[in-house]
Structures are given as structure tokens and as C-alpha cells.
């Protein structure tokens, strides 16, 4: 019998406006992976979607490098593997594609190296590699999660928030925006006054989400001062999306992660009309309704006749 590990890894949206590098939510767009042992000296990567075209298929592959680094960390040896991949998560669009790949690599190393890492340990490892938990935490656990990574202790603490009862619209531009380029425009420091103000806005947003006060939560999301004022000019469609969304009584329109994808939270009774309007008025972008993934990574092992 041939043993195949199957992974279904969700996309994620980070920040929700003012929750910079600390808040994220899993979405129902996925990286699918099927992994099996092969009798070869090298790993084999097979891609079955346009989103993955151009990615390395040799030792420069990020999943390969990460899995081997984890195996080395725990003093185990991984067999040669064949990894089949398909994805509907666009690359470099602010939807956690790199976090999904990272989490996939950790699950691969954990299973085929028989390391026996718990989900908590997988989170610690993922955050240490990524530097912040905003994408990897919801990717692993699902739902809406706030977290803090302490770079001194290398410990990540997270708390799960009930997912908002709203509809989610993604407006995905046709161009990429690399995280490193998007981070380059951010200031190195903030004044004490500015930090206090943004902390207050973030705290209020969290409380409003917990209390299902989505108008208040949205008001706070749109007052971010940590990153959005510096990044909006990189996304020409942003202001028009926010304007149209407000005309349809949306709760908030913010940048998803580092962008360029634009995230809109909308009342369920308004979302259909809004997404159709966005498709009509901003037709160079792909606007779509998505739902929140609440379970995180789905992994299963299947056995096939050889």
C-alpha cells in the first residue's frame, strides 16, 4: 500500500486594519498538497495550477528548504518525496501564500520525520521562522486569531476570537506586491503618542468584534496608523473600493496583509450587490465573496494500492 499525506491549507488575511502583525483570519481559499515517498535521490514537485507556475522545482524550493531545516533541527532524516500541489491562493497578493507554504512544509517534516510536534509546537516554529503570528496562527488553527511573538523568549501566545458574522469580499488586483517592498515604505519608529493612539484603536476594535458591534469595529479598522497610510498609494484601486463599499453600507475596507488585495467586511444582506458593483466598476480586479475558514489545516493520510 502506498501512503499519501494530503494537506488542505487555508489562505489568510492579516492585520484587519489596525491589528498590524498580530491579528489574522483564515479564509476559504486553499493550497492543496499530496505528498508521497519516492525511490529517487531528489524531491519532485508537480504543479497543477497557474498560481504556482514559475516556482522552483529543485533544492531552491521554499517548502523543500524549510522541511529539511526542520528535520535537521530535530535530528531526523526525511525520505525523498513527491509533492503534488494546486492552489487558488494568488502569490504576493496579501493572502498568506507564503504562510500556507511554510505551514505545509512543517506538516510534511513533522509527518515524514515522525517528529510528533503538537499544533502548539508547530505554531511556535512557524512564528519563529515567519517573525509574527498574524498569518501562520489562523492558517494552523483557523478562525480569527490575535497573537504576540516575543523575539527574546521566542514564545508565541495567541487568543481566538469568535469569527464575525459578516460577509467577506476580496478585491484582488492583477499585480503582485512583495511583502518586502510593502514593508519598505513603513516608518522605522512611531512617536509615543502615535503608538498609544493606535493601541487604543486596536483595543477598541477587538472589544467591538467580541461584542458583535461591527459598525464600531469597522470604524476602528479604518483608522489604522501603523501601516495603511503608508501603503495605500501602492494600491491605486484602494480608494475607489472603499468609496463604493461605503456606498453599500460596508463595515470596513482595509488592505489585506501587505496588499495589494483589498478586504471588505460587509453586512450579509448587502454583500451580493456590492461584489457585483465592484466587478462592474473595477473590472481590472477580481472581486469575490469568500467565507471564513474555522478549522485551519486539514491533514489526512490515505492508503492507495501500489
From Swiss-Prot:
SUPFAM superfamilies given in the database record: GHMP Kinase, C-terminal domain, Ribosomal protein S5 domain 2-like
The protein's annotated pathway: Amino-acid biosynthesis; L-threonine biosynthesis; L-threonine from L-aspartate: step 4/5
Show which residues constitute the signal peptide: none
Q: Which GO terms describe its molecular function?
A: ATP binding; homoserine kinase activity
- Upper taxonomic classification of the species? Bacteria, Bacillati, Bacillota, Bacilli, Bacillales
Keywords associated with the record:
Amino-acid biosynthesis, ATP-binding, Cytoplasm, Kinase, Nucleotide-binding, Threonine biosynthesis, Transferase
Binding residues annotated for ATP, in chain numbering: 90-100
Q: Which EC numbers does the record give?
A: 2.7.1.39
Query: Which Gene3D superfamilies does this chain map to?
Result: 3.30.230.10, GHMP kinase, C-terminal domain (3.30.70.890)
Q: Which GO terms describe its cellular component?
A: cytoplasm
Species the sequence originates in: Staphylococcus epidermidis (strain ATCC 12228 / FDA PCI 1200)
Q: What processes does the entry annotate via GO biological process terms?
A: threonine biosynthetic process
Function of the protein: Catalyzes the ATP-dependent phosphorylation of L-homoserine to L-homoserine phosphate.
What is the name of this protein? Homoserine kinase
The record's listing under PANTHER family reads:
HOMOSERINE KINASE, HOMOSERINE/4-DIPHOSPHOCYTIDYL-2-C-METHYL-D-ERYTHRITOL KINASE
